[in-house]
């Protein structure tokens, strides 16, 4: 693999999130956040081992940039929902730390402003 290329990994955290890899500005891979079911209540959570496998198989290394959306509590989400989201966020940070990947936290308003998506429908940011 040509290591002279710029590689950016964008991660939308949470069990409904996704991963996108750009190489020299071109999307080369997208996938849903890997999840697993935990316990008898069928609680979904981020699958740390599978996330690590994705990053390793895509040859993501210390020279690449990992951008993790840094989101905060949403009105009406509830304590259990926020705890679950925080757990997912922590799993992603832990996987990146274990793989020695440089992690950059970016607030939604910053990346949406960069792509002129402020005040747009949520679906506009998914395309």
Residue ranges and their predicted role:
Residues 1-127:
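Phosphate- and other anionic-substrate recognition elements at nucleic-acid/protein interfaces
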């Amino acid at each position: 693999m040509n290591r002279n290329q710029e590689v950016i990994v964008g991660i939308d955290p949470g069990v409904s999130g996704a991963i996108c890899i750009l190489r020299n500005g071109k999307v080369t891979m997208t996938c849903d956040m890997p999840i697993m079911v935990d316990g008898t209540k069928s609680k979904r959570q981020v699958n740390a081992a599978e996330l690590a496998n994705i990053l390793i198989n895509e040859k993501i290394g210390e020279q690449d940039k990992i951008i993790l959306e840094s989101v905060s509590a949403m009105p009406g989400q509830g304590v259990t929902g926020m705890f679950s989201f925080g757990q997912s966020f922590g799993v992603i940070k832990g996987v990146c730390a274990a793989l020695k990947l440089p992690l950059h936290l970016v607030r939604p308003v910053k990346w949406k402003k960069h792509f002129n998506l402020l005040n747009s429908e949520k679906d506009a940011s998914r395309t």
